[in-house]
Amino acid sequence: MNKILNIFLILLTLSPIAVWGANFSEEEKFVEKFADEAIMILSNDQISKNEKNDQFTTLVMSAIDLNLISQFVLSKTWKSATDDQKERYISAFKTYFINSYANKLDQYSGEKIIVNGSEEAGKYIIVDTNIIREGTDTLKINLKWRLLNKNGDIRIIDLNIEGISLVIAQREEFQSFLANNDG
């Protein structure tokens, strides 16, 4: 799970490559803008690591629907939780999520995102991209961004890296923890 999370965090910081004349959907533009802003923050040598972390946290919180993700991750346990427990859990989940990438912001090493297109999947839009790093350590990874667009408010719901859903992996990890600790 940590390897997948590390890949996710690096992928959040990638600079997209636009195809000249491409007719990007609103969701494709969202992914491109998110990656552009992330790389601008992470490549800024004029600010401290703490400032980078604060700016990146603000960007992530504005782009990812952590409320919805946290509910999905908790699964059945969410339904039986009290309102107070739900509120405390969402707050703790956000802190956990943010802290999981805070020390990994320096891992960006020039990867680029190529937006391949998008498709509808029920109420979601899947933006298909490839992560490319060229040079001595060539890398190509397929990444699918699951987005929810509610009246123009687009949020990242999940990332699927080479067929592995990060949200489902997170859910399995949390469910295992709950099962092993009397839930």
Report the location of each language-model feature.
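Sec/Tat signal peptide C-region and signal peptidase I cleavage site
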Residues: 17-23
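Surface-exposed, charged secondary-structure patches
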Residues: 99-141
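Non-transmembrane domains of secretory- and envelope-associated proteins
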Residues: 165, 169-183
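A mature extracytoplasmic/lumenal domain signature
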Residues: 93, 117-119, 131-133, 145-147, ...
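Bacterial N-terminal signal peptides
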Residues: 7-16
